[in-house]
A protein has these predicted regions:
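Catalytic, metal-anchored helix/loop core of enzyme active sites in primary metabolism
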Residues: 1-382
Length: 382
């Protein structure tokens, strides 16, 4: 790989991707961000991408003022994201934007024949069947960047057939509230929810980890990536985040991938596969590891995981409705407008409010997302 495009370069995954860019000494074709102009200015001056994209026209105009002395071209909005995903110079596109905004640029990158390092799980949650079918049709590689799905990818590098897989076991740290019961969770604060025990991540995914919705989204993502039914995707709580996930085969053998809890490992693998390169991450020292523990998740205290499994079983527009509702509810929570348990209540009500379509088109998926968001805003005001 010679050149990369990063969608979401100012966020947590994007910044860690740039650490790997420094380590591998490769060039950057395009960078995209939300509205963090200050950080984008720093990145553009350091990496000199051909293209920089901001979420809004106002942010793009401010960026133009700040970096008008360098040849980086500037665009904004969805059109800019699609352009960054298909820029000719890039061999690989890391999709690290959060939410449904990643769907259209991911599809565009697939059609442009780019290798995709997929950190935007919502793309597969909402439209996984369409996305994977398009990737197969175009012969495009999709390599997951989530630590759990990267682990499964590595466990299956021997090209095991689907018939040899008994189940996938996704590990879950349990988040900051592991062990708490429902009544205790009624009084947790946002500051507590944003304090993940093992991983450094952006605010949205950190809240998803606190509710266990993130693991529910990953269950659906695993089903789409590996074409497996819900019954073959399990979740276990593993507090240490050393075993990143496992595959149990039909003969009873279990293969696990282990490593330090550092996202730069799966990011780099997505960029260098099938090769492995030295990575600027502390090596796992088994002699100093604490004991490795595993437990079942408490889906009564954390009902978002159960809701996600229910939507996964239902399929169709249930998944994009759930995802859109969750994005909207988490945004309200981060804005201090609802409580922690209101997230689940709003999402479950929104899913039920959206008309169900078993085999939706892309337009129908986008409409389900829109209706679910509207339902959350409507119910939250009541």
């Amino acid at each position: 790989m010679r050149c990369i495009s990063i969608l979401g370069s100012t966020g947590s995954i994007g910044r860690q991707t740039l650490d790997i860019v420094d380590n591998l000494n490769i060039s950057v074709a395009a960078l995209t961000a939300g509205t963090n102009v200050e950080r984008m200015v720093q990145q553009c001056r350091k990496y000199r991408p051909a293209l920089a994209v901001m979420a809004t026209e106002e942010a793009a105009a401010q960026l133009q003022i700040e970096i008008g002395d360098i040849p980086t071209r500037i665009n904004w909005g969805e059109e800019g994201l699609v352009e960054a995903a298909t820029v000719a110079e890039a061999d690989c596109v890391i999709t690290a934007v959060v939410g449904m905004v990643g769907l259209k640029p991911t599809l565009a990158a697939i059609r442009a024949g780019k290798r995709i390092g997929l950190a935007n799980k919502e793309t597969l949650v909402c439209a996984g069947e369409l996305v994977m079918a398009e990737a197969k049709h175009c012969g495009t590689e999709i390599i997951p960047v989530d630590s759990e799905h990267s682990a499964i990818y590595q466990c299956l590098m021997g090209n095991h057939s689907k018939e040899e897989i008994k189940r996938i076991i996704l590990t879950c740290s349990g988040g900051p509230f592991y062990g708490m019961k429902k009544e205790q969770l009624q009084t947790v604060t946002k500051a507590d929810a944003l304090r993940h025990p093992n991983w450094k991540m952006g605010p949205k995914i950190t809240i998803d980890c606190a509710t266990l919705m993130n693991k529910g989204l990953e269950v659906i993502e695993a089903m789409r990536l590996y074409d497996l039914p819900l019954e073959q995707v399990d979740v276990v709580i593993h507090r240490q985040s050393i075993v990143h996930s496992m595959v149990e085969f039909t003969d009873g053998a279990v293969m696990a991938q282990m490593g330090s809890p550092d996202m730069r490992l799966p990011i780099q693998l997505a960029m260098t596969y099938p090769e492995r390169k030295e990575c600027p991450v502390d090596a796992l020292d088994l002699l100093t590891c604490s004991s490795l523990t595993f437990a079942a998740p408490d889906m009564e205290a954390f009902p978002c995981l159960a809701l996600a499994r229910q939507c996964a079983k239902q399929g169709g527009t249930a998944c994009p409705a759930m995802n859109g509702a969750n994005e909207e509810a988490v945004a309200l929570y981060l804005a201090d407008k609802i409580g922690f348990y209101d997230i689940y209540d709003l999402v479950s009500k929104a899913v039920n409010a959206v008309p169900f379509i078993a085999n939706p088109t892309l337009d129908e998926i986008l409409e389900a997302d829109k209706l679910a968001r509207e339902a959350v805003r409507r119910v939250a005001k009541q």
